[in-house]
Amino acid sequence: MDYYDIDSILSENQKVPCTSTVSIPGLGHEGRMVPTGSKVELPFWLAEVLAINSFVSIHMPAPFSSVVRNALKANPNSVSIRDITTHYYHFAEKMLHLISDDSLVQISLNTLRSRAMLIADASLNPQGALQQNSQFIEGLDDFEKHILRVSHNAHRSLINWQNSTS
């Protein structure tokens, strides 16, 4: 986790379903023991450490379920990623450090590629984009919103530079 990066902190606080492979003292409610085979949801930052040390096995969290994957495969531009999780790409990156899943890699890359075209279009004409694609813009996750802002600011800077050199 990047100590000062709020997006990293928020993405690592996403809950991840796990199954304990050993009894873990002090991890349960009010410091109780979690018995072997218990299903628990832990924040990613804790699940990662426990999984690396073989105390838990991690299962795929809801933002990467087969339902979400199928929706993203069918038409990534129609999915409101923000409703799934506000830090989809950061969370996917973190999960892929633990779980090898080529399908998730391809779906995430294809989703970003497809949505990047609409994001770029919206950054060039923000008023028109808000009128035509308000639902799409509202469904952007935080990384996509960052791309939208950076692209819009770069376009504005280019126009200002062109006007100043004329």
From Swiss-Prot:
The UniProt keywords, alphabetically, are: Cytoplasm, DNA replication, Nucleus
Explain the purpose of this protein: The GINS complex plays an essential role in the initiation of DNA replication.
The name under which this protein is listed is DNA replication complex GINS protein psf3
SUPFAM superfamilies named among the record's database cross-references: GINS helical bundle-like, PriA/YqbF domain
Q: Where in the cell is it found?
A: Cytoplasm; Nucleus
The family classification in the record reads: Belongs to the GINS3/PSF3 family.
Cite a single GO BP annotation.
mitotic DNA replication initiation
Query: One Pfam family this chain carries?
Result: Sld5
Describe its assembly. Answer: Component of the GINS complex which is a heterotetramer of sld5, psf1, psf2 and psf3.
List the GO terms this entry assigns under cellular component, sorted alphabetically.
Answer: chromatin; cytoplasm; GINS complex; nuclear replication fork; nucleus
Q: What is its main location?
A: cytoplasm
* Lineage of origin: Eukaryota, Fungi, Dikarya, Ascomycota, Taphrinomycotina
